[in-house]
Amino acid sequence: MIVIVTGMPGSGKSKIVKEFEKRGFPSVSLGDIVREETLKRGLELTKENVAKVSIRLRQELGQNAVAKLAVEKVRALLKGSQVVVIDGVRSLDEVGTFRGAFPEENIIIVAVHTPPRQRFERLKARGRHDDPQTWEDFEERDWKELRFGIGGVIAMADYMLVNNGSREEYEAEVKKLVDEIISKL
């Protein structure tokens, strides 16, 4: 089984990924693949360089470029695990790449929605090199994600978590969701 986790930046995707990992299931981050590719090209890990490499990859390999680069990692992990989690799918082209590469696997899409103001505050506090520090940067990043097609992936989700309450409430919802998905094995 492949579980695709999607949502806008700062929505709470990593909590779902970590819950699967705590239960022994591996994950592949498409964002990490872009960051690795940035370093391979001899570039410093800055917001601008990562964005440029992301765009270049899509120009060189198509809109599903990052998913194509992830397929072999996912294939290798599936040899040793009943579930592999993929974090950071941003377009239906990428979903299609995984469906095409793994026709025998049950592919489940989980989306997380969190109100924009909450996401902005989380991203500011997270402090990763590519996280926005101003509302304008945040909105620009959101529009970029939407242009990539993340809205289509969210719309096609098999499960939708709304993360607008307390941390404890969300963590309980995540555990319940992971229990439900694992019960389908």
UniProtKB/Swiss-Prot annotation:
<dbReference type="InterPro" id="IPR022970">
    <property type="entry name" value="NTP_hydrolase-rel"/>
</dbReference>
<dbReference type="GO" id="GO:0005524">
    <property type="term" value="F:ATP binding"/>
</dbReference>
<keyword id="KW-0547">Nucleotide-binding</keyword>
<comment type="similarity">
    <text>Belongs to the UPF0200 family.</text>
</comment>
<feature type="binding site">
    <location>
        <begin position="7"/>
        <end position="14"/>
    </location>
    <ligand>
        <name>ATP</name>
    </ligand>
</feature>
<dbReference type="Pfam" id="PF13207">
    <property type="entry name" value="AAA_17"/>
</dbReference>
<dbReference type="InterPro" id="IPR027417">
    <property type="entry name" value="P-loop_NTPase"/>
</dbReference>
<keyword id="KW-0067">ATP-binding</keyword>
<protein>
    <recommendedName>
        <fullName>UPF0200 protein TK1334</fullName>
    </recommendedName>
</protein>
